């Protein structure tokens, strides 16, 4: 299982938001490429980049940093935030992204995944599913859909999604631990890899997620607030059977 550090960018800074709220930040640091390098030096084998300006208002102000991280980090990068068209996804793959993370547009129109998989290949498509109170939410968690994560997950898998990034919004950014059940349901019901995100605060949380069979876990606030030491976490996960 991979432990994947998050580098979330807003206005050319590295930030960690509380429950996705742009006005509530746990962390705000300069120079995202330096932060990315620090995580790789501590053993990260993959990075999770999020362009929050792209996600929140469709502006691509962090491209320069994104390209620098892709070029210089030396590890594969999965990237999301503001990918609202097939062209946006193709642009990031051309720049060297290993996976592009598609959110709202995939849930609203799963057919787009079929088209995208023809263009860039399934293995490069990661669909982001965010759930609140058992239902998938879209548009920056503002709008609740009628689907459960498993229902939409199966549709997206059929359409050609290569993996799922699953965030349990109820736990995200609150630093009070994880609820394993919704993630386990996805792992048990889908064939494609599931990457978990949201609420991880201890190495024990990571080991529980490894136990249920997730492919990777995105860690954010906990490593920025020094609740988890990344190097120790990666070692613990690699040692556990």
From Swiss-Prot:
Associated pathway:
Amino-acid biosynthesis; L-histidine biosynthesis; L-histidine from 5-phospho-alpha-D-ribose 1-diphosphate: step 4/9
Q: What is its EC number?
A: 5.3.1.16
Any one GO CC term of this protein is: cytoplasm
Q: Which InterPro entries does its entry note?
A: Aldolase_TIM (IPR013785), His_biosynth (IPR006062), HisA_bact_arch (IPR006063), Isoase_HisA-like (IPR044524), Isoase_HisA-like_bact (IPR023016), RibuloseP-bd_barrel (IPR011060)
Q: Can you cite a GO biological process for this protein?
A: L-histidine biosynthetic process
Q: Which Pfam families match?
A: His_biosynth (PF00977)
Q: Which residues form the active site?
A: 8, 130
Q: Give the Gene Ontology MF terms in alphabetical order.
A: 1-(5-phosphoribosyl)-5-[(5-phosphoribosylamino)methylideneamino]imidazole-4-carboxamide isomerase activity
* Similarity remark: Belongs to the HisA/HisF family.
Stored HAMAP family = HisA
The molecule here is called 1-(5-phosphoribosyl)-5-[(5-phosphoribosylamino)methylideneamino] imidazole-4-carboxamide isomerase
Q: Which organism is it from?
A: Methanococcus maripaludis (strain DSM 14266 / JCM 13030 / NBRC 101832 / S2 / LL)
């Amino acid at each position: 299982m991979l432990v994947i550090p998050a580098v979330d960018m807003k206005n050319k800074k590295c930030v960690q938001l509380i429950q996705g709220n742009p006005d509530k930040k746990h962390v705000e640091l300069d120079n995202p490429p330096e932060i990315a390098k620090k995580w790789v030096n501590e053993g990260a084998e993959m990075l999770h980049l999020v362009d929050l300006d792209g996600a929140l208002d469709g502006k691509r102000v962090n491209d320069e940093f994104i390209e620098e991280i892709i070029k210089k980090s030396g590890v594969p990068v999965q990237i999301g935030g503001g990918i609202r068209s097939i062209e946006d996804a193709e642009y990031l793959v051309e720049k060297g992204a290993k996976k592009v993370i598609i959110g709202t547009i995939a849930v609203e129109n799963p057919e787009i995944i079929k088209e995208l998989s023809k263009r860039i290949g399934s293995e490069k498509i990661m669909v982001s599913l965010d759930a609140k109170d058992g239902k998938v939410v879209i548009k920056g968690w503002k709008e609740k859909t009628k689907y459960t994560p498993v229902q939409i997950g199966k549709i997206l898998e059929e359409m050609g999604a290569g993996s799922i990034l699953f965030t349990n919004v109820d736990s995200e950014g609150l630093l009070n631990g994880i609820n394993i059940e919704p993630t386990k349901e996805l792992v048990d019901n889908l064939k494609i890899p599931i990457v978990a995100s949201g609420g991880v605060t201890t190495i024990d949380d990571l080991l529980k997620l490894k136990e249920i069979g997730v492919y990777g876990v995105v860690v954010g606030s906990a490593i920025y607030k020094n609740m988890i030491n990344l190097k120790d976490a990666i070692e613990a996960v690699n040692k556990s059977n």
